[in-house]
């Protein structure tokens, strides 16, 4: 399955940092930036999430919630989040079911670096799946997509 711009975003419920479960539906009425990343404490993922964290005010200023998803377990996520002081939740998709729903699994079974902007009605308004995960989408591009989604 693969989600495209204009599709209803599939709901999910998975554990995340802070000892709670997160679902897309709990953010109904709010824009969500759903970030899939290959792994905790890897060079590009660390740079990407630190960039989004450092510029988090740009997301919150346009009413968006960032959720970051990878296949690592909660112990790994808690260490990674604490080490870097992330102000958004890291969600644990250990069985890769959510990555499968969004069509982000790469050939080796890891999530590809991907970002989705989901509007307040739950519709995908922006989708980017990296072929090679050596770069990531800049904050300005994502904020532009959020503004365009209205």
Language-model segments: which ranges?
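Chalcogenol-based redox active-site neighborhoods
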Residues: 1-150
């Amino acid at each position: 399955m693969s989600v495209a711009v204009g599709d209803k975003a599939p709901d999910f419920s998975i554990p995340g940092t802070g000892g709670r479960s997160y679902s897309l539906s709990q953010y109904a009425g709010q824009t969500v930036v759903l970030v899939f990343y290959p792994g905790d404490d890897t060079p590009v993922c660390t740079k990407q999430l630190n960039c989004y964290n450092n510029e988090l005010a740009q997301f919150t200023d346009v009413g968006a919630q960032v959720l970051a998803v990878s296949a690592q377990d909660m112990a790994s996520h808690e260490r990674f989040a604490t080490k870097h002081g992330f102000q958004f939740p890291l969600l644990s998709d250990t069985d890769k079911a959510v990555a499968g729903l969004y069509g982000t699994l790469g050939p080796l079974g890891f999530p590809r670096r991907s970002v989705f902007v989901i509007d307040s009605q739950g519709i995908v308004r922006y989708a980017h799946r990296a072929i090679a995960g050596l770069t990531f989408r800049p904050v300005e591009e994502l904020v532009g997509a959020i503004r365009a989604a209205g």
